[in-house]
Amino acid sequence: MKIKWNSEQIPKMNVKNNKDVTFLTYPAYEEMNWLVHGFSTRFGGVSRGIYSSMNLSFTRGDDESCVKENYRRISDAMGFDMNSIVTSDQTHTNNVRKVTEKDRGKGIVIPRDYTDTDGMITNVPGLVLATFYADCVPLYFADPVNHAIELSHSGWRGTVQKIGAVTIEKMSEEYGSNPKDLKVAIGPSICQECYEVSEDVIEEFEKVFDKKYRNRLFYRKENGKYQLNLWMANKIIFLEAGIPEENISMPNLCTCCNPEFLFSHRASHGKRGNLGAFLGIRS
């Protein structure tokens, strides 16, 4: 299958295939051998129909046994134990939760006992954080000095609430992370050319982003709608929080441009499964 990349940016994400499961990785994160990480695609699972085939959502109507088998396969392919996963409870907040050993397996093999969690941080070896997508923006964070990690889910609401900056502050508070040391990545998600929004959404961005950024964030069309750039918005948030530009990996891969390769809510009109972002510290 031909993948549509959104730029000629080098390096692109790596497309991996292991044990008949296709997933994506970041070159910058592969250089940190203390990490395990990846981003799933639609390929390598057992789900059928609109969920075909690597659906990672238990809540969209897919057969639970298929979803569990998909988790077993993606975990095996990426190189970690399925029972070590800790999942988010995404409700478009900027809430970031510290994950500890007692959370191991929550959302996969045991029920979650927390809600409204769009970001998770940890420094516990052997745990793997997981967040879920079908156009919204995955944010990866790694601190190579303190060996701490974080994953955040940032749709337009999370971006307006600057969950990226909240995450960096939380990592600093909990683990002493310095923004200058962090290696961050923006994951596959909807690109500006695919993301049409109404004026009320743009008004929310105008409230929290300086005027000097507006030409980089959105433009107005003749129909009164706007095209919004969530990738650039999150990059600006990172830069303003003190992340060096060379430490930011951009996605250059749009979910909506690649609906046969990645799940996209917009491209499928809501008839879809979920992709997964995974990030863990090796034991």
Labelled PLM ranges:
Residues 1-283:
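Active-site microenvironment for binding and transforming phosphate-containing groups
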